[in-house]
Design a protein with these regions (language model features):
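Hydrophobic, aromatic-rich transmembrane alpha-helices
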Residues: 60-71, 146-154
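Residue-level signature of transmembrane alpha-helical entry/exit and packing/kink sites
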Residues: 6-11, 79-84, 186
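Aromatic-anchored segments of alpha-helical transmembrane domains
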Residues: 16-23, 88-97, 168-180
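Membrane-embedded catalytic cores of phosphoryl/pyrophosphoryl-handling enzymes
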Residues: 2-3, 8, 118-210
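N-terminal transmembrane-helix/juxtamembrane module of multi-pass inner/ER membrane proteins
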Residues: 1-64, 99-111, 115-119, 129
């Protein structure tokens, strides 16, 4: 299957899975997580896997830029590292714009002033271009930030694909367990991050190998 067909298959599957989750699964899973799991600390810890990645990517790119100005020419593995960082930062930039565009409320209320949520207010839905942190649930930034670099590393280091698969699964489990995101947010963030990672890697790594 060539890249165009894979892209089309991804779009079709996203167009099916995300609306299906929003309509049939999101509220039930959030309600179950809130009532049964009570946000265990282990779930919160799993979401922290993502936290160091954006600042680390920014620092690595800044250092790489300074090194290039000093005459350094990166080899293949250095290009992999740079590509991973670029994919991550591109993905989270796009994610922020999509959060604003979709304006989805959160599963729970944790902001001041009070943000409307499913658990507290039975608020559920999208208010397009609303803006504000209380309307930023979709897509999941955590899943976007973990799947973008993983998509690059999946191609560059195929021997470690078990690790690359495990990382987003762990983050997703943490997000569901902590009731930080609806399942639909998680699916959407996964597609976004993967698309950014595959796209950046297809250009940068293929060009480097040429």
């Amino acid at each position: 299957m060539n890249i165009a067909r894979r892209g089309l298959a991804a779009l079709v599957s996203a167009a099916i899975l995300i609306p299906a989750s929003v309509e049939f699964a999101d509220r039930a899973i959030s309600t179950w997580s809130f009532a049964e799991l009570h946000r265990p600390k282990e779930a919160i810890w799993l979401t922290w896997i993502v936290e160091p990645l954006p600042p680390a990517a920014a620092i690595i790119l800044a250092l790489a830029g300074l090194a290039v100005l000093g005459g350094w020419r990166p080899g293949y593995w250095s290009r992999v590292a740079i590509t991973t960082c670029v994919a991550l930062l591109v993905a989270i930039t796009i994610k922020e714009q999509l959060k604003y565009a979709f304006g989805r409320t959160w599963p729970e209320t944790w902001l001041t002033p009070h943000n409307p949520s499913w658990i507290s207010d039975q608020a559920f839905g999208f208010t397009f271009f609303h803006g504000g942190q209380g309307w930023g649930s979709f897509p999941s930034g955590h899943m976007t930030a973990i799947t973008a670099p993983v998509a690059v590393l999946w191609q560059a280091l195929p021997r470690l694909r078990v690790v690359w698969l495990a990382l987003p699964i762990l983050v997703a489990v943490g997000l569901i367990g902590a009731d930080y995101h609806f399942l639909g947010d998680i699916i959407a963030g996964s597609y976004l991050g993967t698309a950014c990672g595959v796209g950046v890697a297809s250009f940068a790594l293929r060009k480097a190998a040429a």
